[in-house]
Structure formats: structure tokens, C-alpha cells
Amino acid sequence: PAGRARADGGGDAPDRRDPASLRIGGVTPFSSTDFPGRLAAVLFLQGCPWRCGYCHNPHLRESEGDVRHDYASFVGWLATRTGLLDAVVFSGGEPTAQAALGEAMQDIRSRGFAIGLHTGGAYPRRLAQVLPLVDWVGLDVKAPMPAYGAVTGVSGSGIAANASVRLVVGSGVAHEVRTTVHFDLTPPEALVALADELAAIGVRRWILQPFRPTGCAEERLVAAAPSGERVDEALLARLRERVPGVEVRGP
């Protein structure tokens, strides 16, 4: 019948590059921490190809997961926030997993909002396509390249991540690189090796975020998280010899 979307994506089903096809698993209507210096709404998009054990949004991993918000309703609400919000941040999941990301960014920019992106760099080709539309990137780097698969559960993932770091650094877009620190996955010597990799690419600002057990579905990592272990001053000094702008964020 006319007007019914067919299972094969025909009929009136939205094109996968139409912003209406964006699969949104969650929305934070107001954040002062997800885009430095800007007040932002955050869209959490469904889908991620990686299976990092410390992920605190595991419900967003599946691309066809629980889509809780539709794009049209979001932009309708966003129109009421003009003058109150500065930006929209696309997070996830892995936002670059969705083909409609660039079109959604263009649409929201046209409404007068800056664009932020949180990404792990799993899809460097799509990242390259959307970078010209982005005002700030928070890029999650998991581990030294040879150890990437042990964190993400996907062999070869370090190649994509390395390419994405190079893209972001070379783009001139404002950004920060950040790494979650759990010494079972990223012990001190791994962090030093990662600092060498990042320095060789030209990274100058690097945020270390201590592991947070909240939302982590992997009990092994929660149980192994040491109560008193921190990135100490001696380790920080070694890292800053390589990447001057290293900071520890959080407890």
C-alpha cells in the first residue's frame, strides 16, 4: 500500500543519508562539560563496532538498539533552545558509524549551532568527510597501536584509530585526545609507549581519565580496578616529556 515502508528500505522509508534516519539512543538536553567553553545538547547515537570492556554506554553498542528519540522531534525541541544553547555534540556509541551523520551536522549548523563530535576513530573515511563540519573533537584513544585489539576486542582496530588521530591533528579543528586509564589494560609502560606514538603524530593535548566503574558491564575490570592506584607525578613527568599538555581529569 502507498505510504508503507518496505522491509527492503523502499517505499517511504527514510534514505540512510537522510537526517531522519539517524538512530538516537539518548539525549542530554544541557551539558557544560561535553564541549569545552560551550553549553551543548548531546545526542547519543546507536552503534559501535568495538567492544571495549570499560564502556559505560554498552546499551548503545548495537546499531539497531533501542531508538528512543527521533530526529524531527529533537530539532523541533532544539528550535526552542536558540539563544540558550551554543552547540550540539554527537556522541555514542560511535557516531561515525551512521551514514546520515554528515547530513545531520549540516542541518544543525544551518540552524545556528556549533558542532562537537565525540569519536573513537573507528571509521576514518567518514571522519574525514565530517571534519569540515565540526568545531571541536573529543577523540578517544585506547592504547598503543599493537595493544588496541586487547582493549576493543577487534583486531586491526589500532590502524583505524591511528589514521583518525592523524586526520584530526592535521585538520586544524580544535580537539583533545583522551585515554581511559585502567592499569590492567593500559599499565604505565603502555601509556609511555602511547605517548611516544601521539608525540610522533603531533598531539600536544592529552587527557588521562581514570577508569570509572559506573555503567561498566565487565565485572573483571570492576573487580580489578585498584582503589588507590593513580597516575602519579613520576609517570606524569615521563609522559609530559613526550606530550607537554598531559592532564589527569577526574578522581
Please place each PLM-identified region on the residue numbering.
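A secondary-structure boundary/capping signal
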Residues: F44, S91-G92
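Auxiliary Fe-S-binding modules of radical SAM enzymes
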Residues: P1-G37, G170, L185-P251
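Conserved AdoMet/S-adenosylmethionine-binding subsite of the radical SAM
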Residues: V75-A87, T96-A223
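Canonical Radical SAM [4Fe-4S] cluster-binding loop centered on the CxxxCxxC motif
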Residues: T33-H69
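Short, flexible loop segments at the rims of nucleotide/cofactor-binding pockets, characterized by
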Residues: S63-V67, G93-E94, A114-L117
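SEC14/CRAL-TRIO lipid-binding/transfer domains and related phosphoinositide-recognition modules
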Residues: R16-T28, G47, L60-R61, H69, ...
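Conserved alpha-helical substructure of the radical SAM core
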Residues: P58-V89
